[in-house]
Amino acid sequence: MTNLVVAIDDLHPEQGWGCEGDIQVEYLSELNKKFGVKFNLFSPSYYHNDYPLTKDWVDFWKQFDWIELSNHGHFHDVSPQNKQHIGEQEFLELNYSQAEDRIKESLSLWKKCGHKPNGFRSPGWGINQESADVVSKYFKWVAKHEHINRDIKFNTKSFVGCDGINETENINLYNNDTFMFQSHIAGDWNDNVWSEDNFNHFQLIIDYLEHMYDLNFVTISELV
């Protein structure tokens, strides 16, 4: 069988970004009902220092056995003096001690919400080696970028793959057995988001892949 993972970044308790009643949530539910698709939802624990995770929000997602909640940093933001240069790549600017404090703060909030995430993806993909050393201590696996993170060593299980749900040509098979799609729940800075057009397009991708492969829809932790 050929595995298929769908990962979605940046979900947090803000309307339009992964809350009950959002149209994107309906899209995900429909894909699960129609095909059996499962999802890794990568969530910052305190998005932009404005939207902390809440137990109600976490519980909403945990009710679905086709969802895995994963860590996507804490603030998904950087200090003002660095923002122009590194965007929101939170773990590019932190040293070991700072990164450990940040991860502990993040996991503390997750714990208050009743969940311990197994996996991690860096906001904006960027991470330095000291931060990677910290991340490796606290998570069972990391989703990394095969090019951006090529010089970074993680002392934990790692997975690569970031094909967009809006792809039309370049869909890759990783490790000869896994399709790995990566997307964002919303945002106006790229086209790889859960719009109606991309939802419809992704259904065509799944239809095509199901005709070509015996698909096994999984979350990343099910691959560990």
Report each predicted region and the residues it spans.
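His/Asp/Glu-enriched short active-site or ligand-binding loop at hydrolase and phosphoryl-transfer sites
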Residues: A132-T168
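C-terminal domain-boundary segment and adjacent tail
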Residues: K33-G36, A143-K144, I185-V224
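A conserved mid-domain beta-alpha-beta active-site/ligand-binding segment of alpha/beta enzyme cores
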Residues: K153-N175, Q182-N192
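Metal-dependent polysaccharide deacetylase catalytic core of the NodB/CE4 family, i.e.
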Residues: V37-Q129, S183-W189
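Well-ordered, non-membrane alpha-helical segments in soluble/globular domains
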Residues: G18-L28, P52-D56, Y96-K104, E167-T168, ...
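Generic beta-sheet signal
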Residues: N3-L4, F39, Y174-S183
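Active-site beta->alpha N-cap acidic-glycine motif
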Residues: M1-W66, D214
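Non-transmembrane alpha-helical segments in soluble domains
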Residues: S29, V58, L107, K111, ...
